[in-house]
Amino acid sequence: MSKHIHILGICGTFMGGIAVLAKQLGYKVTGSDANVYPPMSTQLEEQGIELIEGYDPSQLDPAPGMVIVGNAMSRGNPCIEYMLNRKLAYTSGPQWLSEHLLQHRYVIAASGTHGKTTTAAMVAWILEYAGLEPGFLIGGVPQNFTESARLGGGYFFVIEADEYDTAFFDKRSKFVHYQPNTLIMNNLEYDHADIFPNLSAIQRQFHHVVRTVPSNGLILMPDNVPALDEVIQQGCWTPLQCLGTEHNSHWQAKKLRDDASQFEVYCKGKLAGVVKWGLIGDHNLQNGMMAIAAAHYAGVELNQAIAGLGAFKTPKRRMEVKGEVQGIRVYDDFAHHPTAIATTLAGLRAAVGSERIIAVLEPRSNTMRMGTHQQALAQSLMQADDVLLYQPAGLDWNLQPVADELCVTNRSDSTNESGIDNSHKAAIHQHINDLISDITMRAKAQSGPCHVLIMSNGGFAGIHDKLLAEL
């Protein structure tokens, strides 16, 4: 078979990462996407990968040895129809990874509704810090590295394990293909309403991956998460270690600061050390503990894992500070699920105390656009002082009820247990320029520091740079 691989949908982070790995394995790699754009296009071209914009079937003539089909591709796409009609050899990204790379490596997979990218980046960095030169494929760009994917020089391979479906011809979750030796299950909630009818359907996929973890491997998960407990109750053939607050948990963390920027690490009830780092929030504490546990099982000494975590930098788009102008700090975060929104805001609130927080949200994920989480959205934003919602064209539901719920009129009845006033001023905008003007006005209207937290899993029309320029 020809060593030429052609990737359909190459500019996504996952498929672009596969392109980089295939190139490093010695394949000739080409690919196409509907829109070829930086930064992924730049990364790929620097690797010597030829990119084609659009899906004209001529790109498949002469036929490559293998077509790797991204999960965004569907029937009716000209390249897909040509590929099927000509009976070209094709596979999915996860299946190709399994057959050509993961079979020969010790795989550490980070799964869960939230925290996959950050946890995978933490594990990869701790292994790197320990001199183990791991390979990795991560859905964001870890700031401790210069790329989102690399082959690595060691035995270990760290992968962000996504439960989204594999391809138009394989509706199993991607992670079912990864053959993990160590599986991290961070959490589990209902998400991806476009492909999963209910939580049970997602749990079924999680149990499929649990079934593939060998008996000499490891499964890591938090205590007291009923949705994960139910997955394990369906059958588990692998040693299980849990993170929790109970003394009988294998792993425990004790916060030394409310914002979780310092915490003690306990293993089997014994103090192993203290993490002091630049991240905040209970969600990041849990991500970090999972990473320490996974790295320790891979052979990293606990003191070295703790030191490595202390030197970890959050991946881009995870509470990433984009800039600060006259005491107004602008953050970018990938949060797009009510739980992630709430935990991100709670972490920021713990860090900044009573300083003003303006939360800006674009409901862009498929699940959010369908309105699946609309009932929980207002509650998830309660830690912010101001909430500005972007109503993009094509959103299937109206954001006004969320804004109405946030606009509490009686200030005396709206203080939460932490003493933070939850009498919100919420607004909805349909145009980016109007949204930026409103953020600017609100941020400058108050004396003292202000924190603008922008949350979206998309580009949000470049709002961060535009806002900083306006400020």
Feature names for model-found ranges:
Residues 34-37, 55-57, 73-74, 223-227, ...:
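Short, polar loop motifs at secondary-structure junctions
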Residues 255-271:
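Acidic-glycine-rich active-site phosphate/pyrophosphate-binding loop
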Residues 32, 54, 93, 137, ...:
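Generic beta-sheet signal
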Residues 2, 105-107, 260:
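Short coil/loop residues immediately preceding or within conserved phosphate-binding loops
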Residues 52-55, 93-98, 137-140, 236-258, ...:
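Beta-strand->loop->alpha-helix junctions that form or flank phosphate-binding loops
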Residues 21-24, 45, 59-62, 71, ...:
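Phosphate-binding loop of NTP-binding sites
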Residues 1-36, 45-51, 62-67, 85-88, ...:
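ATP-dependent carboxylate-amine ligase
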